[in-house]
Amino acid sequence: MLNIGPFSFHSRLLLGTGKFPDFDVQQKAIDVSEAEILTFAVRRMDIFDAKQPNLLEKLDVKKYTLLPNTAGAKNAEEAVRIAKLAKASGLCDMIKVEVIGDDRTLLPDPVETLKASEMLLEEGFIVLPYTSDDVVLARKLQELGVHAIMPGASPIGSGLGIVNPLNLSFIIEQATVPVIVDAGIGSPADAAFAMELGADGVLLNTAVSGAKDPIKMAQAMKLSIEAGRLGFEAGRIARKRCATASSPLEGMSVVE
């Protein structure tokens, strides 16, 4: 089970809802992924105007936990305003804090992310900050009392996969809250690798919505995350420089 604050989930796949070709493909991809948490940018939909088409009117929202994010925020104050807007609409009190500090790489601003997380915790939100693979920043966020850490595998939408597995492993090893790898996942192999490192979950969007067949890719991501988690729990064999025979040699007769 994936436990975030007071919530428990069977699926360890968190799915973003942007960039799908149409609502039908989006719905089918969500269904086959079996994701229980769906994330979306509050700024990209008018959640108060029923006349405007959006994700929420097409989905049976009772089946999912919605994770609004603060994408578009440039500082802590903007992030808090967006989070409060989502809460006022009656959505889940869980919020993904996203404060971008660089427009080229879309990497998060560490100072503003810390500040926004602290402010939102004081407001009673369940806080999941998107961060880089900075080990120290992850620890500081954890010390604030956030409910999960969401380090990026690589820049948002890049599909580069996990570019710094060592730092991710350090973050996971020191974590006392769930670690959900977020951003940069490009393939099922990337998702499986994140889980094999010991991540508690994976959040992705473009890898599915931008695939040639989003529905098949959603299923592939589901299976790879399950396989990666099983592999982590099973425990891989140690790496060795020399070969070790898989069949025992003792008791074997030698034909001369």
From Swiss-Prot:
Enumerate the InterPro entries for this protein. Answer: Aldolase_TIM, Thiazole_synthase_ThiG, ThiG
Q: Which reaction does it catalyse?
A: [ThiS sulfur-carrier protein]-C-terminal-Gly-aminoethanethioate + 2-iminoacetate + 1-deoxy-D-xylulose 5-phosphate = [ThiS sulfur-carrier protein]-C-terminal Gly-Gly + 2-[(2R,5Z)-2-carboxy-4-methylthiazol-5(2H)-ylidene]ethyl phosphate + 2 H2O + H(+)
Extract one GO cellular component term from the record.
cytoplasm
Question: Which residues of this protein are catalytic?
Answer: 96 (schiff-base intermediate with dxp)
Say which domain of life the source belongs to: Bacteria
One Pfam match, given by its short name, reads ThiG
Q: Which GO terms describe its molecular function?
A: thiazole synthase activity
The biological processes this protein is annotated with in GO are: thiamine diphosphate biosynthetic process
Q: Which residues bind 1-deoxy-D-xylulose 5-phosphate?
A: 157, 183-184, 205-206
Q: Where in the cell is it found?
A: Cytoplasm
E.C. number(s) listed in UniProt: 2.8.1.10
Specify the pathway: Cofactor biosynthesis; thiamine diphosphate biosynthesis
Principal subcellular localization: cytoplasm
Q: Which UniProt keywords apply?
A: Cytoplasm, Schiff base, Thiamine biosynthesis, Transferase
TM regions (residue ranges): none
Query: What assembly does the database describe for this protein?
Result: Homotetramer. Forms heterodimers with either ThiH or ThiS.
What this chain does, per the entry, is described as: Catalyzes the rearrangement of 1-deoxy-D-xylulose 5-phosphate (DXP) to produce the thiazole phosphate moiety of thiamine. Sulfur is provided by the thiocarboxylate moiety of the carrier protein ThiS. In vitro, sulfur can be provided by H(2)S.
Q: Which HAMAP family match?
A: ThiG
Looking up PANTHER family in the UniProt record yields: THIAZOLE SYNTHASE (PTHR34266:SF2)
- Report the family membership: Belongs to the ThiG family.
Instruction: Write down what this protein is called.
Output: Thiazole synthase
Q: Species name for this entry? A: Bacillus cereus (strain B4264)
Taxonomic lineage is: Bacteria, Bacillati, Bacillota, Bacilli, Bacillales
The gene that this protein is the product of is thiG
